[in-house]
Amino acid sequence: MKVSRRESTRRRHRRVRRTIVGTPARPRLSVFRSNNHIYAQVIDDAAGHTLAAASSLDPDLRQSLTSGGNQQASAAVGKLIAERAQAKGVTTVVFDRGGNLYHGRVKALAEAAREAGLEF
């Protein structure tokens, strides 16, 4: 039986998460991509705490976005998550693409976060 795209994403995510762990010094920038929106969190896996979060559903972005599921929305979320992480004192992170390919919306979020000052 053919493996679905969603199952391929889940397998990649499990494989990636075996090696990527967020520490207090270098937390994990986790990305979740749905059809209509994109979500990002900065997570300290050692403590099990989310340090910062942003999404295309965020009230700060919702009014200015025409759609939550395009590259412009992803770039806006990347910039917002970088600002919120830096406000908490986080400058370097480990990027967790969530099993998604580094292309399109995931790439737009990552590049916007880098431009806004996060290092990874």
Curated annotation (Swiss-Prot):
One of its GO terms (biological process) is translation. Disulfide bonds: none annotated. Keywords: Ribonucleoprotein, Ribosomal protein, RNA-binding, rRNA-binding. GO terms for molecular function: 5S rRNA binding; structural constituent of ribosome. Pfam families: Ribosomal_L18p (PF00861). NCBIfam families: L18_bact. HAMAP family: Ribosomal_uL18_B (MF_01337_B). Part of the 50S ribosomal subunit; part of the 5S rRNA/L5/L18/L25 subcomplex. Contacts the 5S and 23S rRNAs. This is Large ribosomal subunit protein uL18. The lineage of its organism: Bacteria, Bacillati, Cyanobacteriota, Cyanophyceae, Synechococcales.
